[in-house]
Amino acid sequence: TIDSEKLIDTLQPLARSNYFAIQLAFPELPEIDFMVNTESVIRDANHYDFVFNKLEDVQSKIEYQNVVNFRLNRDISFLSNFRFRINEQYFEEFISLNNIDTFVDGGSFDGQTSLEFIRRKKDYSKVIAFEPSSQSYLAVCDKLKDYKFIDVVNKGIWNKSESLSFNSDLGSASRIENEGTLKIEVVSLDESLDEKIDFIKLDIEGAEKNAILGAKRIIIENKPVMAVCVYHHQEDYFRIPQMILEINPHYKVYFRHYTQGVFESVMYFLPLKPTQHV
C-alpha cells in the first residue's frame, strides 16, 4: 500500500487528472470482486442501510457512505477526501487501551501491528500473533524477538482446526484459496485460546467471516474490542457487522477507511458498558 497523494504531489508541476481503470492498466490481474458485483449495493441496500444506521459517529457514516458509493458508481471523487493513514489503522482515538491486556493479531504478516500495539500499551500482558505463511512467520518472530510475553503462531485463523490450501505468492495479500499450492494449518480462536482476550484484530484476506464464527465464545464471554477488515469482499461491508452483532448485540460500531484507494476499510466494535445495554 502506498500514499498515492504524496506520490502524485511529487509529479507537480506536471498536469494531474483522475483516471480509474485498473483492468486496463493491469490486464493480467484477476477481476476485482467489487468491480463485478456492484449490483450487491443495489440488491442489498437494506443491509447497507442497517449498518449505516448502526454506526456510532458522523465520521463513520460519512466514510462508509463514500466507500459504498464509490463501489457502486466507480466514481473516484468519492475517495477524494480520504488520506493515507496506515499508521493510525487499528488504533483510533476512540479506542482506549487502558483495560486492554491481551491482544490477538490475526494476519500478522510482518508483525508491524503487534509492534504498534506494544509501543502504545507498555504494560500489556500478552500478544498472540497468527501468521500462516512460513516466510512471514519468521519475519514476525524476528521483529518481536526482543519483547516479552509474545506468542507467534504459525497458523491461520478459521472456524475450526484443519488443513487448507494457501497461496503464499501474494505478499501481504497471501490467502486461503482452493488453487493454493501450499497446505497450512488453521485453527479457531475458541479452540486455541484459553485466556481472556481483550482486543482482536483481523486482516486475513477474506477469511474474516470464518474467523468470527470460530470466535463466538470469546465474543460472547470476553466482549473484546474488535478491528476487522471488511474490504476483501463486497458483502463484507454488511455481513461482518451483522454477524458480530448477531453473536453479541452489545457493541458500538465504527468505520474508518485508510487509503485513497479501494483497500484498508476497517470496522470497529467496542463493547458497550453494562449501563448502556438496551
PLM region descriptions:
Residues 1-278:
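Phosphate/nucleotide-binding beta-alpha loop and adjacent structural elements of enzyme active sites
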